[in-house]
Amino acid sequence: MSTTRTLTRWAGLLAASAILFGACSTPAGTTAPSAGSAAPPPGSAAPSADGSAAPSGAAGPSEELIAAAKAEGGLTTIALPRDWCNYGEVIDSFTAKYGIPINGLNPGGSSGDEIEAIKANQSNPGPQAPDVVDIGFSFGEDNKDLFEPYKVATWDTIPESAKSADGAWYGDYYGVMAFTTNTAVAANPPKDWADLLKPEYKGQIALDGDPRTSNQAIQAVYAAALANGGSLDNAQPGLDFFKKVVDAGNFVPVDANPGTIVQGATPVALRWSYNGLSHRDSTADNPTIDVVVPTSGRFGGVYVQAISKFAPHPNAAKLWMEHLYSDEGQLMWLKGYCNPIRYDDMVSRGIVPADLAAKLPDSTGAVFPTPAQLKTATDLITKGWDATVGVDVVVPPE
């Protein structure tokens, strides 16, 4: 199904996911956010035409925090491509507002790379030590001991199901898995998972990331399982499906990125909807990029933010979090097609511009795994890729 953009259909997705979560019993404080947490609550205000704000009821960062952050002289982030969730604007606005330069490490890195960077630099306060991470949902609770708890001013407006009770990590945004296609190479973009096995896509199908370490790639395999006889409790059919894609000669063992998609090296890439849509906009039809949420196996994925327990700039890290979870920061993510975790609060106060809300893709029926399901699937996929699929996914040369 193509990315027809209607808020009503998105709300339908959220309601369906809310039902799913209601049926899944998991420990309090660790459940994945029900997509219903991002939909306008019944009877609340619709997105505003102009985005005029109503008070959030939350104070901004204190003058003491701002001064302490500025005194540290910088902030180190990791794995934040400027075109991912509109991070370019988020980064630039932070520096412009507070005068704090940002050292961005490994923009093409995976969630696994982010965790390894924290571990490798526990006693190193230098420029290679990240202050903050933006990682896949399953990486949050699993690595909680590496994070410094901190609750932002808008903490109470973040759904309980989307955060660690002590503030060690909390959801930031989410999207759905989609097919991003360079139509200059693949003139007939695939619409569903079964299409990826067709001979016309020989040497064209790629993952955005290594499924042994990348959250995005791991969850692409998980999504494939849902469309091929698996379930949220059984991701093995996803691995089996990719083995079929390889055997058909359709799989390209290259870590897809906007450059490889445009060049035609990875013309059909499995990526989050927000990555595909922002890439589509950036090419201005040269070439034309098509973004499709598949008909079956519709799968939603949440990311989380956390501060490293070993952050060289702990106050700058806290100020960064305040920036991200402010109304301003959340709307910047929305501009990049990412559904911010505080969406329902902002909609209820009438500050979400209608044009931004209307850009979210039609993803009716998408499901979100619980933390337990996601952990089990992640373990299976990361450990089973080599045995079942047997292909290395390599990063293309610069």
Model-found features: residue ranges?
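Bacterial N-terminal signal peptides that target proteins for export
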Residues: 2-14
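Extracytoplasmic ligand-binding site segments that recognize negatively charged/polar headgroups
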Residues: 76-92, 103-119, 126-265, 279
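Periplasmic-binding protein-like
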Residues: 174-178, 239-244, 250, 284-309
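Mature extracytoplasmic/periplasmic domains
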Residues: 298-299, 303, 308-368
